[in-house]
Amino acid sequence: MDYLESLDFPKVVEIVKKYALSDLGRKHLDTLKPTVNPWDELELVEELLNYFNRWGEPPIKGLNDISQEVEKVKSGSPLEPWELLRVSVFLEGCDILKKEFEKREYSRLKETFSRLSSFREFVEEVNRCIEQDGEISDRASPRLREIRTEKKRLSSEIKRKADDFVRTHSQILQEQMYVYRDGRYLFPVKASMKNAVRGIVHHLSSSGATVFLEPDEFVELNNRVRLLEEEERLEISRILRQLTNILLSRLNDLERNVELIARFDSLYARVKFAREFNGTVVKPSSRIRLVNARHPLIPKERVVPINLELPPNKRGFIITGPNMGGKTVTVKTVGLFTALMMSGFPLPCDEGTELKVFPKIMADIGEEQSIEQSLSTFSSHMKKIVEIVKNADSDSLVILDELGSGTDPVEGAALAIAIIEDLLEKGATIFVTTHLTPVKVFAMNHPLLLNASMEFDPETLSPTYRVLVGVPGGSHAFQIAEKLGLDKRIIENARSRLSREEMELEGLIRSLHEKISLLEEEKRKLQKEREEYMKLREKYEEDYKKLRRMKIEEFDKELRELNDYIRKVKKELDQAIHVAKTGSVDEMREAVKTIEKEKKDLEQKRIEEATEEEIKPGDHVKMEGGTSVGKVVEVKSGTALVDFGFLRLKVPVSKLRKTKKEEKKETSTFSYKPSSFRTEIDIRGMTVEEAEPVVKKFIDDLMMNGISKGYIIHGKGTGKLASGVWEILRKDKRVVSFRFGTPSEGGTGVTVVEVKV
């Protein structure tokens, strides 16, 4: 029994097939079915998706379906020139793809496609022997060149003689010309003059007035041309056979290349599908959890994401709610996504989604839209359920839609409960939809089951398609009837016919729905506040980092200026000595030594004076020539440890000047306003086209503010936006480098860019 069809599996595969490059990939996609070990395929899809996000599309050349050409080679028939060209381009594409993955860091892709065999010699031979238009080149063989050279010489001789014949026999010709038919040069001779020249008549015009004659003097020449043409044909056949035999001798390698390219094309299509549907690669887990799962058959503008989690201590969901509320789509999505994951497909959902491997996936999907189900429909469903119950075990995922419907509600409910109990006893994991109140109550009291319902908006009389976990759904019949204007007297009459327990249950369900709606609203508010808090926290952390960076840059500048000054003074002294007009060289050297000794003595004296009399822990100081004020922490051996707020430096006391604490504010040239410019931008939610001007302006702002590094927050998702940002940065000559952030900077959700300043 094909349960995959009832879960829409084949329809989704058809969508994916549209992204394949050739029939090779489309055929491979048709072979993918759920398996208990989908790791291989999923890891390859994940690596190729990461490749796309970083490098864009891989180099693809001529990766077409050459299955027919391979079959022809196997049969022993030589390939035609255009077929050889097609195979050659395909094999050249294999080489390009193999080399591309060899130089990248994707181990699974590298390992898989390293098995592609190189046919470089064959490709070179084809390029030598066959022109791009499919004609056999003169370079194909020396013999072919000889034949064509002789044929060309002979043809020129015949044309020269033919021109002479036309000129000398113009009186017998119907027209001053000759024709080339069936490899022979013929002349249109007047029928009445056909005996004027010896030759062979080949054709007669429809009017009978003209005969096409081959003069005897041309017969031998024409025969020689025909012979050369036959030799040319045989030589070309030999060349084509020779090229085909190269492929035949490596048939196993050729077939393996075709299989590997079919697999690559299949992976390519799945990755394109993931990028188009904002999908992610979900790997087998020990639990079931859907995070913003989107059924791929529902148009993007109308799909409502499904969020659902089955706790480890539970083995089933009973989902209730009004018709057209999304129950069937919800359970179908669970089954479909499980089957797709087990077949190696990415899923249209968010990160955090988890799915289990089930060796058996079985489903009976009802017709939720049916107004009235007949006995035959009930029998049809029951036949499927009998098969499911018979085969179910602890390895089974069972999807049952509208269980117990289509018959008497009391009997249907009893039957549904009995079926659910049997499936749970066998260890199956179940997802069931129903309208029946006894089944809802049963689920509320069963330790292995969870109730869920589809949210309904009584104000608009329409479903929201959101799943509410932990509470059964109501029919909302009275609310809908009242809203549509049914007499209240009739509605009250209907209510009075409900049992006390039924009224209490409906009231309880309604109350739970209201409370859950409030909790969901609070949850959304808290989530929004948390996101705002995280943004604020990131902002302050960045402000702190920027302030610290600018402080360090300020001290670097001061130290550079100090060193420049020292070098300048030394240079001036050297020049003074060099241009001195009096005194000997030895005297000059002695004078320099004396100056340097005095300088050292002076500095030592300043150190001692500063250490003993001036600089002490707690003092506020500035570096010589500097503006930033710091506080002395300790003084040891002529060196002070100074705290400048965001930075501590060890500085010779001779380079420090005591100052007042207030001077820090008055004299410091350092000024930073974190609110004036931020070194990060958040482009999440934008398209690449929307983000491009924002990113370029951000680079402008960085350079105008003299800041070399910035952070672009694009989020993770499919990586399409990140890939687009990298392409923008790669083309911008102002950009020095860019990379993904470290874990502390935001990981692959952030790009760190450095610009020229």
Swiss-Prot record:
Activity regulation details: Nuclease activity is stimulated by interaction with MutL and inhibited in the presence of non-hydrolytic ATP (ADPnP). ATPase activity is stimulated by DNA.
Any one Pfam family match given in the protein's UniProt record, by short name: Smr
EC id: 3.1.-.-, 3.6.4.-
SUPFAM superfamilies, per database record: DNA repair protein MutS, domain III, P-loop containing nucleoside triphosphate hydrolases, SMR domain-like
Entry coiled-coil feature ranges: none
Keyword presence, Hydrolase: yes
SMART domains per UniProt: MUTSac, MUTSd, SMR
Positions with a binding annotation for ATP: 321-328
Uppermost EC category: hydrolase
Top-level lineage group: Bacteria
A single GO BP: negative regulation of DNA recombination
Domain Smr positions: 681-756
Assigned keywords, A-Z: ATP-binding, DNA-binding, Endonuclease, Hydrolase, Nuclease, Nucleotide-binding, RNA-binding, rRNA-binding
Disulphide linkage map: none
An example Gene Ontology molecular-function term: rRNA binding
Subunit structure: Homodimer. Binds to stalled ribosomes, contacting rRNA. Interacts with MutL.
Free-text function comment from the UniProt entry: Endonuclease that is involved in the suppression of homologous recombination and thus may have a key role in the control of bacterial genetic diversity. Has ATPase activity. Binds to DNA. Acts as a ribosome collision sensor, splitting the ribosome into its 2 subunits. Detects stalled/collided 70S ribosomes which it binds and splits by an ATP-hydrolysis driven conformational change. Acts upstream of the ribosome quality control system (RQC), a ribosome-associated complex that mediates the extraction of incompletely synthesized nascent chains from stalled ribosomes and their subsequent degradation. Probably generates substrates for RQC.
Family: Belongs to the DNA mismatch repair MutS family. MutS2 subfamily.
Name of the protein: Endonuclease MutS2
Organism expressing this protein natively: Thermotoga maritima (strain ATCC 43589 / DSM 3109 / JCM 10099 / NBRC 100826 / MSB8)
Phylogenetic placement of the source organism: Bacteria, Thermotogati, Thermotogota, Thermotogae, Thermotogales
Gene label: mutS2
